[in-house]
UniProtKB/Swiss-Prot annotation:
It catalyses: uridine(13) in tRNA = pseudouridine(13) in tRNA. This is tRNA pseudouridine synthase D. InterPro entries: PsdUridine_synth_cat_dom_sf, PsdUridine_synth_TruD, PsdUridine_synth_TruD_CS, PsdUridine_synth_TruD_insert, TruD_catalytic, TruD_insert_sf, TruD_pseudoU_synthase. GO terms for molecular function: RNA binding; tRNA pseudouridine(13) synthase activity. Keywords: Isomerase, tRNA processing.
Length: 347
């Protein structure tokens, strides 16, 4: 499988070390944080699961069968990796207030555990989470000193907030299909495919812009015409506030953003517009898809700064712990640390 992200720039250059990632499911652990409390009553049974080596959609479908409902009656806040040990909530629409007997379901699938149940007055929807906690083990690391040096840099300034390769499908197939749909003006009622290809299109253009900022030495520097993310919202940067915004960036009070392309004009001006616009112009097929679906322009921070980053070395293995906001990719952190050695998985 080719790496669709291989052309994108690194914060501190391509890693020196190599390592195995997800050599075992336990080497990639994810714990979902919804960030809100359940009401304790309502039409929806909330089920917290821990799954090993299974994807979210499969577990949801099997849980639906166990509850005697249709697959559409089970929902989630976020899809979790198959090749991992992950904890997340699923909601099941059971308006009569019943709690099914899960014993047969659990006996059939030893890779799935039910950790807790609750009740809520609303179903879960994609995006109903504030973030995820990660425990990631890199095994058979070839140059631990370089990895730890890079981790210190990550702790200081973060990493490029790239969308991970999973956003683009196997071998970038989602991106290829997004271009084809835009080129051929494909129309469909399949909301899942439409959403998947639109996400791939916008994510790729964003990644290219972030990479260009790294290549041009302005990943950690505001330029004239930028759009900053502040605690109050988005703010235009120009000559009048450039120095002040740079000082605030150093204090992590504001962040630089890049385009999530839409059918309206970029809000950037001057130097920032000159940097971003070429990546819009060079993808006419992706932009045809985006414009045809009336996606509105949005912004995303270009730096991913993990919270509570720590690590522990045992021999030639290193285990990282950190938290990320929803929508960010742990693989974007790992990419800055090591070159991945492919693992033949039996799970």
């Amino acid at each position: 499988m080719s790496d669709i992200l291989s052309s994108l720039a690194y914060l501190t250059g391509k890693p020196v070390a190599s390592a195995k990632i997800k050599a075992q499911p336990e080497h990639f652990q994810v714990r979902e944080d919804l960030g809100f409390a359940f009401t304790g009553e309502g039409e929806h049974l909330m089920v917290r699961i821990r799954k090993t080596g299974e994807n979210t959609s499969f577990v949801a479908n099997e849980l639906a069968k166990a509850c005697g409902v249709k697959s559409k009656d089970v929902s989630w806040a976020g899809l979790k990796d198959r090749h991992a040990v992950t904890e997340q909530w699923l909601s099941v629409h059971l308006p009569k207030g019943e709690t099914p007997d899960f014993s047969t379901f659990l006996a059939q699938y030893p890779s799935i555990e039910i950790l807790a149940t609750d009740r809520h007055n609303k179903k879960l929807r994609p995006g109903d989470l504030i973030g995820n906690e990660f425990v990631v083990t890199l095994s058979e690391v070839t140059d631990m000193a370089d990895v730890e040096q890079r981790l210190e840099k990550v702790k200081q300034v973060g990493v490029p907030n790239y969308f991970g390769s999973q956003r683009f499908g196997n071998d970038g197939n989602n991106l290829d299909e997004a271009r084809r749909w835009g080129r051929e003006n494909v129309r469909t009622r399949n909301q899942n495919k439409r959403s998947m290809y639109l996400s791939a299109a916008r994510s790729w253009i964003f990644n290219r812009i972030v990479s260009a900022r790294l290549e041009n030495g302005v990943f950690d520097k505001f330029i004239d015409g930028d759009i900053a993310q502040t605690s109050q919202g988005l703010l235009a940067v120009d000559a009048s506030n450039l120095a002040d915004m740079q000082n605030k960036l150093a204090l992590s009070e504001v962040e630089i953003t890049a385009a999530l392309a839409g059918d309206n004009a970029l809000p950037t001006q001057a130097d920032a517009l000159a940097l971003e616009q070429p990546f819009i112009d060079e993808e006419p097929d992706l932009m045809a898809l985006i414009r045809g679906n009336r996606m509105r322009h949005d912004r995303r921070e270009i730096a991913l700064k993990p919270k509570d980053l720590a690590w522990n070395v045992e021999g030639n293995n290193i285990t990282l712990t950190f938290s990320l906001d929803a929508g960010s990719f742990a693989t974007s952190i790992v990419r800055e640390l090591v070159n991945e050695v492919k693992v033949e998985r039996e799970y």
